[in-house]
């Protein structure tokens, strides 16, 4: 393709949207003395794959850059192969006459107009803006910028060129890789998507409890995020859940179960969620966030009284706390609502003799949760930082033996990670709750211990779909994920027993509608 010169005149013609690709430090330093102040082969590989790959094999992508960025590319590597190189310059002396796959434009507006016109609108799949500093400072927040792909440099590196930070009122993380260290530089790859056209109203609670999502402020103006490159779009962590559900429905073993409902089942599954940039609350259906928070606080309090949750409008334990159910499992002597020595009791009073939900167990048994926190603070390399709800001697006293039964915590690089083992996992109703609950617990313990949240690893024994959930889940897996929300916690809370529901605030949760599924009891 011969080079073309487009002037800077704008006639209000249609323009292409674009996505920014940039590597930057925590204060958004992107260069020093006109070059990248780091050498990261992994970053170059990511850049090449992102900007070169197309879904349509007959199309190519375009990369837009300023003249200085073009000149900073080694001569042997320019133009960037397999891509249309669009160079922004007003210099009349710029020599382009013999360069193939290069277009010269006098402004960003003229470049975007040119790419929206024939033949480029038919041959160019995606448009990436790749630098330099002046271009990015002006167009990182431009209304046509639909995504930002950031190599997040987490090591301290001196820079003299900076760009504005990502505007979190407009953009939210879609995907964040787990951190890697290369050339002694810690970094990760983060893709942000535009969810609003302009700065949203401030996320105030307007008198609501913070655990209530403010749907007015959190409503996305963007509903479909398929504009992302497929390699990024498919990395949304919710696909771990959706793909597992689909696999179980398609090829799971047919099993009977204690409820008589019947399941499709797989054994030995794992999902891993990155807690550093956002919070894994599923978006392909609305998850009962207030219920997640109140139940976890109830566990932490050591309570076994389902009526405490009922009084807050949380009815997730009603089925296992009813008179009829307690009678059916040999607990007819137990008061209705008394669930026995379940999760919270084992977390805070392991080994104590359980009498009923009204007894005062202060100082009785072993407080596993406080032991976990003490070890994280004082012996973070301990490999025995364990929280277990599985107490064989108490199982027959429980209304329901623990499903999520065992958690191990791990400290590295100032971050706290959690791996939870779940013996039995109801993929439709339970697992979305469980992912959120243990991720929240990790956030809380991390804050108490002056750490940052790292990973949540979810290991499942019997992962099953109840037969009466199949149709609802088939509907759910057809939905397209949206960005996970961001969780903010009252930073003044440093005692695990001091948290209240109002200390937690979700920002940017705009899921698909609720999908009804009946609980098997």
From Swiss-Prot:
Q: In which pathway does it act?
A: Cofactor biosynthesis; tetrahydrofolate biosynthesis; 5,6,7,8-tetrahydrofolate from 7,8-dihydrofolate: step 1/1
- Source species of the chain: Zea mays (Maize)
User: GO:BP terms for this protein?
Assistant: dTMP biosynthetic process; methylation; one-carbon metabolic process; tetrahydrofolate biosynthetic process
Q: Where does substrate bind?
A: 21, 43, 130, 151
Q: Which residues cross the membrane?
A: none
Show the catalytic activity. Answer: (6S)-5,6,7,8-tetrahydrofolate + NADP(+) = 7,8-dihydrofolate + NADPH + H(+); dUMP + (6R)-5,10-methylene-5,6,7,8-tetrahydrofolate = 7,8-dihydrofolate + dTMP
Q: Which terms does the record give in the GO molecular function aspect? A: dihydrofolate reductase activity; thymidylate synthase activity
Q: Which SUPFAM superfamilies match?
A: Dihydrofolate reductase-like, Thymidylate synthase/dCMP hydroxymethylase
Q: Which HAMAP family match?
A: Thymidy_synth_bact
Any idea which UniProt keywords this protein has? Methyltransferase, Multifunctional enzyme, NADP, Nucleotide biosynthesis, One-carbon metabolism, Oxidoreductase, Transferase
**Cellular component terms (Gene Ontology):** cytosol; mitochondrion
Q: Give the positions the UniProt entry annotates as the active site.
A: 403
Q: Where does dUMP bind?
A: 258, 404, 422-426, 434, 464-466
The UniProt record lists the DHFR domain at 17-194
Q: Does the keyword Methyltransferase apply?
A: yes
Concerning Pfam families, the annotation shows: DHFR_1 (PF00186), Thymidylat_synt (PF00303)
Annotated function? Bifunctional enzyme. Involved in de novo dTMP biosynthesis. Key enzyme in folate metabolism. Can play two different roles depending on the source of dihydrofolate: de novo synthesis of tetrahydrofolate or recycling of the dihydrofolate released as one of the end products of the TS catalyzed reaction. Catalyzes an essential reaction for de novo glycine and purine synthesis, DNA precursor synthesis, and for the conversion of dUMP to dTMP.
Q: Name the InterPro entries for this protein.
A: DHFR-like_dom_sf, DHFR-TS, DHFR_CS, DHFR_dom, Thymidate_synth/dCMP_Mease, Thymidate_synth/dCMP_Mease_dom, Thymidate_synth/dCMP_Mease_sf, Thymidylate_synthase
Coiled-coil positions: none
**Gene name, Swiss-Prot/TrEMBL:** DRTS
Query: Region Thymidylate synthase: what ranges?
Result: 197-521
According to UniProt, the name of this protein is Bifunctional dihydrofolate reductase-thymidylate synthase
Query: Which amino acid positions bind NADP(+), per UniProt?
Result: 23, 29-35, 67-69, 88-91, 131-138
